[in-house]
């Protein structure tokens, strides 16, 4: 009932806003102008971001990084800000700690867990294809249509659901066998060998509208028959499907606080407990993990001597323009 009411509300909003406002703009300005429930606020966001970029004035700042042999630490102030706007202050901090002793004042470990990503609907697939391969939404849809209609490799593409219905669960072993080749073979082999079952989070009848999430069909595909574009999209969908049979990615986030000559420094790292679904798919957005280092076994009270200082000059950057993915 709620899904029906939501769809009806969107249709009425399209009529009230789209048709009437478009007609009003066209008559008012004697030009082919249009307005819409989605397009007009989206255009406003684009204009606002463009104005922010044009008004932006870059500023110089500096960071101080110390090499302690096995790991690096970064200076920060009392507000955990690492940027130093004054070059003389940055130089003074660098000289102050050169070859000095650093002492660990705190080691903080927090447990983290990331569940497998949800299955693809068309929008999310278009977003990832744009991030990874710069494909436009239309290009991704066309590729998906070929994989659905010509190759019979993937299910219906024009879906807005990221879930499966319970009646599909008995068909999953056959779908796994269909992708048991190429780079997917070892993963599928492990799923069958360890008798992994699909995550309950992927199955929800109430959240499936006309069509379920995009997954492989029960037809085995000759990968050599796919062109590069088709193989890329097919691989994205298959890997996302396979992640649903794996547990969460579990890890410990480690933050170390140190002092040297009255200045505060910190380092961040990550210790993997269970790789889980990341055995299959590394993830599209891993900037945070890439910035973290592998830390040695550290304890409060440990001391280290500064081996080297890195004083880095940087400039503040304007807000990024929106892409088709964002």
Locations of regions flagged by a protein language model:
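Toprim catalytic domain recognition across nucleic-acid enzymes
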Residues: 1-326
């Amino acid at each position: 009932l709620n899904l029906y009411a939501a769809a009806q509300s969107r249709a009425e909003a399209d009529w009230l806003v789209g048709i009437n406002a478009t007609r009003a703009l066209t008559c008012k300005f004697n030009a082919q102008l249009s307005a819409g429930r989605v397009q007009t606020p989206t255009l406003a966001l684009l204009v606002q971001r463009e104005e922010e970029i044009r008004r932006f004035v870059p500023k110089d700042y500096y960071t101080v990084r110390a090499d302690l042999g096995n790991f690096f630490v970064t200076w920060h102030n009392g507000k955990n800000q690492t940027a130093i706007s004054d070059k003389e202050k940055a130089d003074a901090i660098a000289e102050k700690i050169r070859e000095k002793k650093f002492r660990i004042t705190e080691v903080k470990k927090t447990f983290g867990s990331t569940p497998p990503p949800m299955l693809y609907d068309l929008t999310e697939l278009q977003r990832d294809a744009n991030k990874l391969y710069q494909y436009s939404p239309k290009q991704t849809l066309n590729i998906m249509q070929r994989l659905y209609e010509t190759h019979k490799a993937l299910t219906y593409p024009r879906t807005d659901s990221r879930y499966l219905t319970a009646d599909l669960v008995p068909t999953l072993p056959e779908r796994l066998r269909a992708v048991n080749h190429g780079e997917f073979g070892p993963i599928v082999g492990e799923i069958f060998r360890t008798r992994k079952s699909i995550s309950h989070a992927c199955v929800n009848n109430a959240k499936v509208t006309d069509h379920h999430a995009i997954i492989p069909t029960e037809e085995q595909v000759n990968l050599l028959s796919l062109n590069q574009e088709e193989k890329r999209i097919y691989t994205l969908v298959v890997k996302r499907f396979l992640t649903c049979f794996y547990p969460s990615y579990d890890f410990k986030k480690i933050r170390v606080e140190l002092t040297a000559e009255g200045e505060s420094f910190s380092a961040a790292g990550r210790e993997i407990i269970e790789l889980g679904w990341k055995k299959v798919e590394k993830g599209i957005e891993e900037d945070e993990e890439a910035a973290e280092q592998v830390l040695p076994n550290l304890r409060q009270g440990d001391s280290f001597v500064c081996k080297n200082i890195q004083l880095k000059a940087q400039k503040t950057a304007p807000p990024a323009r929106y892409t088709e993915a964002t």
